Amino acid sequence: QTLAQLLKQQGPLPLARWKELAGSLLRGLGMLHRRNILHRDIKPENLHLGDDGQLRLLDFGLAFCPGLSPGEGHQLPGTPSYLSPEAFQGAVPAAQQDLYAAGVTLYQLLCGHYPYGEIEAFQHPRFGQPVAVSRYRPDAPAWLDELLARAVASEPQQRFETAEQWLLQLEQAERLALEPRLRPLLEREPATVWRALAVASLLVNLLLAWLLSH
């Protein structure tokens, strides 16, 4: 089944399942881009989850290879809600546009909504700030909110440069979130800290008294 069918049947994905699929999508995109292939129509309908659990990209009808594909690819490709702002402005096809579409896709799979609302083919959308993930998914960690906000940023230079960079950030953020935080001594043993401060204060006062008397 496609991820669009999965979303329709089950609704927004649990965090653990979402992270697994996000990693698969980013690894697949990274492999495509290293081969100089731009998919140009990333969306849940074009992502198939097989019985073997493998995620596969479908529909390469709009795929573009810079320097090899005929024409310059300036025609508006793909599905409007997944198109990057620069694609609407007629920018030359680039990996950044695939990464933006992947960001919208992953946002939708997690939240059940589009970050900028649904965009119709006849619209000329204005992109401001995406709706925070936490509005739809209060259970999402703060780092995930920040990660997806960067993925679907309206300015290309604010997004991830490559699928590999995005995947690394995803893995590192999750790992850091799972690591136990070393609590400060004041939190762990407040009585010990206050006793030590009291003793230190007493010693300072005694030293000052001795200095003043000599």
Question: What are the residue ranges of the model-derived segments?
Answer:
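AlphaC helix of the protein kinase catalytic domain
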Residues: 2-13
